[in-house]
């Protein structure tokens, strides 16, 4: 039987010439840039399990969300407990925060993760059943400055990676009481149009009418264009918070648009929500986003602490870099390829390879024993910078010839001079 990869997932291999975004050296570059950026902002890594109790996501994400109703990978373990592969990163981080009592260590916790997420979705550009997400969460501060810092972190990452033509959309969805009043006004507006809404939006009319606002259906978009605005229903505290956030973004020179239709897809958000969109991702033009969820910790049985976070898909970041023609890093190649000719030379090369690696010089050695022409061809295929052949003559004289493969230049030196020469 010949096995193939399941639908909706993919392999990340060293170099993928057909679909370059699936090349691991690009992922390594993006992840290293992420780690450098989050540490500049004082965020620390957190890692949580691939699966959690299903109830965690039901309580946090919301029973009426698409994730819970359509997209979760759920199974029963041998103990009869319902478990789910994590569909998003915030709920597991909150669970870990509570369970490990992180609030007792410091009043403000700034955490980040890079991890795979799982959703059973229809395959389309930018959407996969396993996708990889970078997320950050700031727990313990309710200020608009914290909101602005988190948005600045995400925006800075995109800029460091060279992304262009980004649009930051922001909105405030206020408090629960604000949304309760707005929800009724929205339903009153939508009711005469109910039969003209898409089937998804008709289903959401009773359970989660705010989600109709960000429907991608063209007919739905026409209908909600004249709907009441959540911004007209904000309480004074939410209004002040949102106005201050806008001032801070201007201060940071981060361009933004206020989008009153932006509500995000998860039920736990309040006050600030934001989304970054780009035009090169097919049907899905959102590259990342997030918002504030001040009541989530309390809802999960933890302390009543304010929180804000975001998530951004690594697949989408890399695809956008490629689509925008951003200069990409090159794969890592060995600096030196050693070719021994004979058993005695093989012993020397084996020790020499180890010593060079210990000094931080990427080195490979031929173990195949094939003819010299074949080995040189292989060294060229893996794009080695230099090659050295060591045979009986080199063993006797302790002198070698260092050849630069790209130019063909040759340098005479002793074996002892090899490491300092390569370092310089």
Swiss-Prot record:
Its main location: cytoplasm. Signal peptide: none annotated. The keyword 4Fe-4S does not apply. Keywords: Aminoacyl-tRNA synthetase, ATP-binding, Cytoplasm, Ligase, Nucleotide-binding, Protein biosynthesis. It catalyses: tRNA(His) + L-histidine + ATP = L-histidyl-tRNA(His) + AMP + diphosphate + H(+). It is found in: Cytoplasm. It holds the Pfam family HGTP_anticodon. The keyword Mitochondrion does not apply. Disulfide bonds: none annotated. Its EC number is 6.1.1.21. It comes from the Bacteria. GO terms for molecular function: ATP binding; histidine-tRNA ligase activity. GO terms for cellular component: cytoplasm. GO terms for biological process: histidyl-tRNA aminoacylation. InterPro entries: aa-tRNA-synth_II, aa-tRNA-synth_II/BPL/LPL, Anticodon-bd, Anticodon-bd_dom_sf, His-tRNA-ligase, HisRS-like_core, HisRS/HisZ, HisRS_anticodon. Transmembrane segments: none annotated. NCBIfam families: hisS. HAMAP family: His_tRNA_synth. Homodimer. Belongs to the class-II aminoacyl-tRNA synthetase family. This is Histidine--tRNA ligase. It comes from Protochlamydia amoebophila (strain UWE25). The lineage of its organism: Bacteria, Pseudomonadati, Chlamydiota, Chlamydiia, Parachlamydiales. The gene is hisS.
